[in-house]
From Swiss-Prot:
This is Proliferation-associated protein 2G4. Residues 2-48, 301-394 are annotated as: Necessary for nucleolar localization. Residues 358-394 are annotated as: Disordered. Gene3D superfamilies: Creatinase/methionine aminopeptidase superfamily, Winged helix-like DNA-binding domain superfamily/Winged helix DNA-binding domain. The modification Phosphothreonine is found at residues 366, 386. Residues 46-54 are annotated as: RNA-binding.
Amino acid sequence: MSGEDEQQEQTIAEDLVVTKYKMGGDIANRVLRSLVEASSSGVSVLSLCEKGDAMIMEETGKIFKKEKEMKKGIAFPTSISVNNCVCHFSPLKSDQDYILKEGDLVKIDLGVHVDGFIANVAHTFVVDVAQGTQVTGRKADVIKAAHLCAEAALRLVKPGNQNTQVTEAWNKVAHSFNCTPIEGMLSHQLKQHVIDGEKTIIQNPTDQQKKDHEKAEFEVHEVYAVDVLVSSGEGKAKDAGQRTTIYKRDPSKQYGLKMKTSRAFFSEVERRFDAMPFTLRAFEDEKKARMGVVECAKHELLQPFNVLYEKEGEFVAQFKFTVLLMPNGPMRITSGPFEPDLYKSEMEVQDAELKALLQSSASRKTQKKKKKKASKTAENATSGETLEENEAGD
């Protein structure tokens, strides 16, 4: 294989790439479900984060075993953010842990990659809801709002549509539940080994962000991690001084590190994680990792994923799914075990256009018989997907 061929970007136009995405998605969904089941009152968040990451490594270790050079594993470390914590809470052993309690609103966020093809997922639920009862009040409002935002996006992120259409729909859905999307949060296009591709969808932009944010059109064979974060409050996420534990390398930055600890740490980051987000928990010597990261972050070799908070007493819900824009419609490869009947809100979407959108089918068109004959490869690439779509859309 010549160097030129290697440089050529692989997309979901190739069957094998679709397969890798689906395998990663399948693992992400299984790990997520297992963590949701393990989340009950008295369980430590640290233990769940460790369990999630260990499961991802174990499951990705079972596939493509013959491909010794293939990188696979964690594309986003397991983060469990509770109540008013917005995102990226993934404590180290040396940090203060959080113990789940009944009634906590929990967001689990994680990512898996197979050969650099990324499947991200996030899901929100309430801990220990008694059988036969429903979640009501602001928790129900915010979870319903975020879930419907995700459902709207599944129907809007498709070739020919603009990113601004999604942003507008999110504002309308959230506001109908008297909630607000978290200001300035981005959903990114995904490419091989790249979790933050150039096309993005912005949530609830400020006037300045509206001016700066690039309008983009979705195109066939693109992949997106659609990330919805909705707050019962004002939607402003702030850093409250909680230690950052998740970072990723910025391949565009160069700097000659001065400290030996930093150099050793950074070379391990490059070797083990490339440009994927990672947690300092993954290092054998956590103390050295905490020291080594400082100089790397200061000179922007590493980008931090800061732990953010909404105001105390508010609730933030998150749903994230990964979608492949196939020629015959969007294919969602990740989703959580959402149970709509558990959440009872006094509010609902009023906008007629949005209502119609949410009621429209999100399953993909199955290809006509003639087409199938003409393109056996297309059939192979899309076989069995409508079933998954229906499951994901439940």
